[in-house]
Regions:
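Active-site SXXK
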Residues: 44, 50-51, 64, 70, ...
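N-terminal secretory signal peptides and thylakoid transit peptides that target proteins
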Residues: 1-24
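Acidic helix-start/capping segments at beta-turn-to-alpha-helix junctions
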Residues: 125-134
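Short, surface-exposed loop or secondary-structure junction motifs
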Residues: 72-75, 135-371
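Short, conserved catalytic-motif segment at the N-terminal edge
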Residues: 38-97, 117-119, 133-140, 421
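Short, well-ordered beta-strand elements
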Residues: 384-385, 391-400
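Short, gly/Ser/Thr-rich active-site loops of penicillin-recognizing serine hydrolases
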Residues: 323, 337, 342-347, 366-367, ...
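Bacterial Sec signal peptide processing site at the extreme N-terminus
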Residues: 26-40
Length: 426
């Protein structure tokens, strides 16, 4: 998006802003109230991007939250929760954040390390003995023939997707098919009697399926953050969702971040839409991801993709990491722990999608135009990131599948930079 387009978007916004729901006030970190600031006044170019995507019916609605360099929180929004309803999207609307759950799980592991109950290079098998005799597929593209693993899987490997584990959705090879046949699809809503009962059951099933690579040898996006949930549970002696609630969600003030919808939450949950290859065809609502599906009881808590959250809540979480582990007046973790979370801990010689990797999230390495940025995304197009060098955090909430089916992010990012006065070197 070039500067002329941004200026044109500003004109479009000023002419037609009244047709869309704009943001409320901004608040300052540390619990102190800020003067009321309209999102239109602070983020006019970003607001125009949201407005245009909704006006063109590419999305029913979108919500963005920004922790600005001056410490204020700014929320902008456009549209509704569904193409067929008139309930407006807002900072407290609810979204399935899928893999953005991974950053929360990574933070939970970090505070457990701060407690002295876990270390980065501890062998996973010391905590999950089911993993004591892992095997590696000799040719994962051809079959499940395997040999004993030569390398030891560690907590670092789980955090950075270098464990040798994979995802059922990461292709259609023999190993991925074995995951599907075993019911290892964490993060997806399921009935009251799922094939995989809980994290212990998942680990036992994973131990019987070969790894697709030696631990520490390659980056492969995977269920490793789900396995990390079991590590946290066993190392802490506290059920994984309870540990996350006590050590991350409660102190940050993430009151609307849940594993299952509570009574009354369904009215705030945005509909997920699936987009086909024919972009001219209207998207369809995904029935399998309905509010009803997310209200059912759950026994398998997915640290890799199970949370529902709001723009306000997730921005609060990102702001805590940006603010060296402090959420308002509450100390959630030590500054050095917050720094560790956003430190590149990939095994030497590896890259992850062209960059580094921290505690569950991607890191822009030196030389990248977004050097130092840390964050991750969700399957339905949600995105969250912090930029410590430029002192801001941001999150985008939409519900469009598959990921990047509606590529609003490529236009929103330069608009946010322009609104915040950030100049990047190409």
């Amino acid at each position: 998006m070039d500067r002329n387009r941004l200026i044109a978007d500003r004109r479009t916004l000023l002419l037609g802003a009244g047709a869309f729901g704009l943001s409320g006030c901004a608040t300052f970190g540390g619990g102190a109230a800020a003067p009321e600031v309209r999102g239109l006044e602070r983020l006019p170019l970003s607001q125009s991007v949201l407005n245009r995507f909704v006006a063109e019916r590419r999305l029913p609605g979108a919500s963005v939250g920004v922790r600005a360099p001056d410490g204020s929180d700014i929320f902008i929004r456009a549209g509704t929760l569904d193409f067929n309803v008139f309930d407006r999207v807002g900072p407290d609307s609810l979204f399935r954040i899928f893999s953005m759950t991974k950053l929360v799980t990574g933070a939970a592991a970090a505070v457990l390390m701060e407690d002295g109950r876990l270390t980065l290079d501890a062998p996973v098998a010391e905590i999950i003995p089911e993993f004591a005799a892992l095997k590696v597929a000799t040719n994962p593209a051809q079959g499940l023939a395997a040999r004993p693993a030569r390398n030891t899987m560690t907590i670092r490997h789980l955090l950075t997707h270098t464990s040798g584990l994979t995802y059922s959705i990461a292709g259609d090879g023999p190993v991925q098919r074995a995951y599907r046949e075993a019911g290892i699809t964490p993060g997806a809503p399921r009935g009251d009697d799922p094939q995989v009962r809980d994290l212990d059951d998942m680990a036992a099933r994973l131990a019987d399926i070969p790894l697709i690579a030696e631990p520490g040898a390659a980056y492969n996006y995977s269920v490793s953050l789900d396995v990390l949930g079991l590590v946290i549970q066993r190392a802490s002696g506290v059920a994984f969702p309870d540990f996350v609630q006590r050590r991350i969600l409660n102190p940050v003030g993430m009151d609307d971040t849940v594993w299952r919808l509570r009574e009354g939450d369904a009215a705030r949950l945005m509909q997920v839409y699936a987009y086909g290859r024919d972009r001219a065809a209207p998207p369809t609502a995904v029935a399998a991801l309905s509010a009803e599906a997310y209200a059912r009881p759950v026994t398998l808590y997915s640290g890799g993709g199970g949370l529902i959250s709001s723009t306000r809540d997730y921005l609060g979480f990102l702001s805590m990491l940006l603010n060296d582990g402090r959420a308002g007046r509450v100390r959630v973790m030590k500054p050095e722990t917050a720094h560790l979370i956003r430190t590149d801990i990939l095994p030497e010689g590896l890259t992850a999608e062209g960059g580094g990797f921290g505690f569950g999230g991607w890191i822009a390495r030196p030389g990248h135009r977004r050097q130092g940025e840390f964050g991750w995304s969700g399957a339905a197009g949600t995105q969250g990131w912090i930029d410590p060098e430029r002192n801001f955090a941001a999150t985008l909430m939409i519900q469009a599948m598959p990921y990047r089916a509606v590529d609003i992010l490529s236009e929103l990012r330069p608009a946010l930079d322009a609104d915040l006065g950030i100049v990047r070197i190409a």
